Design a protein with these regions (language model features):
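Intrinsic disorder
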Residues: 254-263
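Surface-exposed recognition patches
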Residues: 246, 266-270
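Transmembrane alpha-helical segments
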Residues: 100, 269-283
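Membrane-integral, polyisoprenol-dependent glycosyltransferases
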Residues: 1-146, 150, 155-255
């Protein structure tokens, strides 16, 4: 139910998540058709104009898409006339220019600086504290071990991993009351089974778009992880799409893993547990 409470509140991140998903879908559909690819890029740009998080996620996602489907894209580029290439390049530059200007301006970075972990002086103070415990404050070894890069790096890593904690995903949800339903995770607990089955099946069956799905899941919480408040269900909302796809893949494979009476038993148990969790969520 991760996206349900946010979709009722009119948050901008809902629209951003929609256009990210649409952009990925159109990119895959248009990997052999540049006209569809144009709409994919437009969708990605709209998502970046809609909310802050995609401004970090989308460039990384596009780079990954270009790498994964480079052979298809090279074939398309060869077929496009030089005049059209110039027009498309100028169009992309014009549409991207406001984003670039905002990102490089002080006004555009002000919000990020206010929420960023890098504006927190805690890790920096901790570095000085740890260095003070040694005899030589400026020794090379201590500078390598205790410095701002490692301090903020570990802080970022900790915040990043927060978004994959089982208690966040399936048990308690977001620590912020306004971003959660009490006593409920971001997903139903039964969906943890589908997630595990989906992940194992994805690795075993070598699904065609396995790289894209895994990368999407991994980069989805990057922007949220750079803020001091994690895990954050709102800023990491785009995680819901690849995780839901993975769970759906798990449901399909679970169906084919059991047969006969066992299939009926498993379906019955899943339905009962799901209904119980749904009623609990609605309460």
């Amino acid at each position: 139910p991760w996206h349900l409470q946010f979709s009722r509140g009119g948050w901008e991140t809902n629209m951003a998540t929609f256009f990210i998903t649409l952009g990925v879908y159109l990119f895959i559909r248009g990997k052999n058709n540049y006209q569809i690819l144009i709409w994919s890029i437009i969708s990605f740009l709209i998502s970046m104009y809609t909310y802050q998080s995609p401004r970090l996620i989308i460039p990384i996602l596009i780079i990954c898409l270009l790498i994964f489907y480079k052979n298809n894209l090279l074939e398309i580029i060869k077929k496009i006339e030089t005049k059209k290439k110039i027009i498309l390049g100028l169009l992309f530059l014009i549409l991207s220019l406001p984003l670039i200007l905002q990102f490089t301006s002080g006004e555009g970075s002000a919000r990020f600086e206010g929420l960023s972990i890098f504006s927190d002086t805690g890790p920096s103070s901790r570095v000085n504290e740890l260095r003070g415990e040694h005899n030589n404050l400026n020794s090379f070894k201590d500078k390598i071990i205790h410095n701002k890069v490692t301090a903020y790096g570990f802080s970022f890593l900790s915040h990043y991993l927060d978004h994959f904690r089982p208690d966040f995903l399936f048990i308690r949800g977001d620590p912020l009351i306004r971003n959660k339903v009490p006593e409920t995770g971001q997903f139903y607990l039964i969906e943890a089974l589908f997630l595990v089955v989906g992940l194992l099946s994805l690795i075993k069956n070598r699904f065609e778009h396995i790289k894209l799905l895994i990368i999407w899941i991994l980069i989805a919480p990057l922007a949220s992880s750079m803020t001091y408040q994690t895990p954050h269900a709102l800023r990491a909302l785009n995680m819901v799409v690849p995780l839901t796809l993975l769970m759906g893949y798990g449901i399909i494979n679970l169906w084919f893993m059991v047969y006969g009476l066992w299939r009926k038993i498993v379906i019955g148990l899943v339905v009962v547990i799901f209904l119980f969790e749904f009623v609990h969520y609605m309460e």
